[in-house]
Swiss-Prot record:
Pfam families reported in the protein's UniProt record: PPE (PF00823), PPE-SVP (PF12484)
Sequence similarity: Belongs to the mycobacterial PPE family.
Organism in which the protein naturally occurs: Mycobacterium tuberculosis (strain ATCC 25618 / H37Rv)
Domain of life: Bacteria
Official protein name in the record: Uncharacterized PPE family protein PPE65
One example of a Gene Ontology biological process annotation: response to host immune response
Disrupted gene: phenotype observed: Knockdown of this gene in cells with simultaneous deletion of PPE25/PE18/PPE26/PPE27/PE19 genes result in a severely impaired growth in phosphate-limiting media.
Length: 413
C-alpha cells in the first residue's frame, strides 16, 4: 500500500482523475446481480422438478438415486447464487467508495492555479510586500495535500473491504472418475483400429504397385508381361477384388469361373471342381454297379431265349391253318362299306343291321336312330353282332349296352 501522505496533491489528484471512473465497476456489479438471479431461478426450477418426480409417478431405487445425486447440485446452485449476489454488492460498495474519494479529491486545476499564483507572488516580491500572500498560498496548498491524502487513504480502505469475497466452491462431482480411464482406453482402441485400417488400405496399394513392375522395362518385355497376366491388373468397381488379365486371367477364370480375385475364390473353386468331382465319383459308382450286374442279366436273357427257341417247334402245329388260308385267299379282294375298304369276310358273314336295333342297343330313341351317324364306321354294325363268328355271345343285340365309338375328327368333314 502506498503512503499517500508522501505524495504531493498533484500526484494523488492525477491518480484519482486519470482512471475510467466508477462505470466499469457498476457494470460488473450489475452482471453479478444478474448471475445471482439466474442461479436462484435455476435452483428453484431444479428443486421443483426433482420434488415433483420424487413425490409423483417416479418411485423406487432409481428415483432415490436421482434425488441423492441432484440434491447437492441444487444446494450448490443456491450457495453460488448467494456468493454471486454478494460479489455484486461488493462491487457496488467499491464503486461507492470511488465516488466518495473522487469528490473528496482536490481537482487538479485548482492545484495548478495555486502553484501558478505562488510563482507569480514570488516573482514580484521585490520589497517583501507579497510575504503574507505567499504564506496564505502555501497554507492553501498544504490543505490540498492533506485533503488528497485523506481521500486516498479512505478510498484504499474501502476498496480493501470491498474485495473481501468468499471463494467460490466447485460443484459436487457426480461422474465416475474411472470413466476418464475407460475413455482413454477406448481412444487407444480406436487409434489402434485406425492403424489397422490404414494397414489394410496400404496392403492393397502395395499389391497394386506391384503391377507396375515392367513400367520402365523395354516395350517387348511389357507386352510379354501383359500377355502372361503379370501386369495390367485393375481393381473392381467396388474395390473388393483384383481383376487379372492375360494368360493368368484366363487360367483364373477357367479355375474359378471369374477373372476377379476376391474373397469368394475358394468357394468358386470348390463349386466348380470339387463338387462336380464328387458327383462324377458317385456316377462312376453307379456305372460300376451296372457293369457288375450286366453279365448276370445277359446270361439270364440268353437262357430265356434258348427255352423259347426249344418251345417254338411244338407250338407251330397249333396255329389254325384255316384262318391263315382264309386270310391268304382274301388278299387283294377287299369289299366296300360306304367309302371304306373292308375285308370281304365282313360283308359275307355280317347281315345288315336295322336302325331300330342299333338305336335300341345304344339306348337311344327313334329320333336318334334316324339321325345320321357321326363316327368313323357310319352305319356299319359292330363285329360282335354278326352270325357264324367265334364270339357267339355277342351274336344278339344287347339292350342297355352303350358301344364305344371313335368320334369323327374335324379333318374328316
Amino acid at each position: 500500500m502506498l503512503d499517500f501522505a508522501q505524495l504531493p496533491p498533484e500526484v494523488n489528484s492525477a491518480l484519482m482523475y486519470a482512471g475510467p471512473g466508477s462505470g466499469p465497476m457498476l457494470a460488473a456489479a450489475a452482471a453479478w446481480e444478474a448471475l445471482a438471479a439466474e442461479l436462484q431461478t435455476t435452483a428453484s426450477t431444479y428443486d421443483a422438478l426433482i420434488t415433483g418426480l420424487a413425490d409423483g409417478p417416479w418411485q423406487g431405487s432409481s428415483a432415490a438415486s436421482m434425488v441423492a445425486a441432484a440434491t447437492p447440485q441444487v444446494a450448490w446452485l443456491r450457495s453460488t447464487a448467494g456468493q454471486a449476489e454478494q460479489a455484486g454488492s461488493q462491487a457496488v460498495a467499491a464503486a461507492s467508495a470511488y465516488e466518495a474519494a473522487f469528490f473528496a479529491t482536490v481537482p487538479p486545476p485548482e492545484i495548478a492555479a495555486n502553484r501558478a499564483l505562488l510563482m507569480a507572488l514570488l516573482a514580484t516580491n521585490f520589497l517583501g510586500q507579497n510575504t503574507a500572500a505567499i504564506a496564505a498560498t502555501e497554507a492553501q496548498y498544504a490543505e490540498m495535500w492533506a485533503q488528497d491524502a485523506a481521500a486516498m487513504y479512505g478510498y484504499a480502505g474501502a476498496s480493501a473491504a470491498a474485495t473481501q469475497l468468499s471463494p467460490f466452491n466447485p460443484a459436487a462431482q457426480t461422474i465416475n472418475p474411472a470413466g476418464l480411464a475407460s475413455q482413454a482406453a477406448s481412444v487407444g482402441q480406436a487409434v489402434s483400429g485406425a492403424a489397422n485400417a490404414q494397414a489394410l488400405t496400404d496392403i492393397p496399394k502395395a499389391l497394386f504397385g506391384l503391377s507396375g513392375i515392367f513400367t520402365n522395362e523395354p516395350p517387348w518385355l511389357t507386352d510379354l508381361g501383359k500377355a502372361l497376366g503379370l501386369t495390367g491388373h485393375t481393381w473392381s468397381s467396388d474395390g473388393s477384388g483384383l481383376i487379372v488379365g492375360g494368360v493368368l486371367g484366363d487360367f483364373v477364370q477357367g479355375v474359378t469361373g471369374s477373372a476377379e480375385l476376391d474373397a469368394s475364390v475358394a468357394m468358386d473353386t470348390f463349386g466348380k471342381w470339387v463338387s462336380p468331382a464328387r458327383l462324377m465319383v458317385t456316377q462312376f459308382k453307379d456305372y460300376f454297379g451296372l457293369a457288375h450286374d450286366l453279365p448276370k442279366w445277359a446270361s439270364e436273357g440268353a437262357k430265356a431265349a434258348g427255352e423259347a427257341a426249344k418251345a417254338l417247334p411244338a407250338a407251330v402245329p397249333a396255329i389254325p391253318s384255316a384262318g391263315l388260308s382264309g386270310v391268304a385267299g382274301a388278299v387283294g379282294q377287299a369289299a366296300s362299306v360306304g367309302g371304306l375298304k373292308v375285308p370281304a369276310v365282313w360283308t359275307a358273314t355280317t347281315p345288315a343291321a336295322s336302325p331300330a336295333v342299333l338305336a335300341a342297343s345304344n339306348g337311344l330313341g327313334a329320333a336318334a336312330a334316324a339321325e345320321g351317324s357321326t363316327h368313323a364306321f357310319g352305319g356299319m354294325p359292330l363285329m360282335g353282332s354278326g352270325a357264324g363268328r367265334a364270339f357267339n355271345n355277342f351274336a344278339a343285340p344287347r339292350y342297355g349296352f352303350k358301344p364305344t365309338v371313335i368320334a369323327q375328327p374335324p379333318a374328316g368333314g
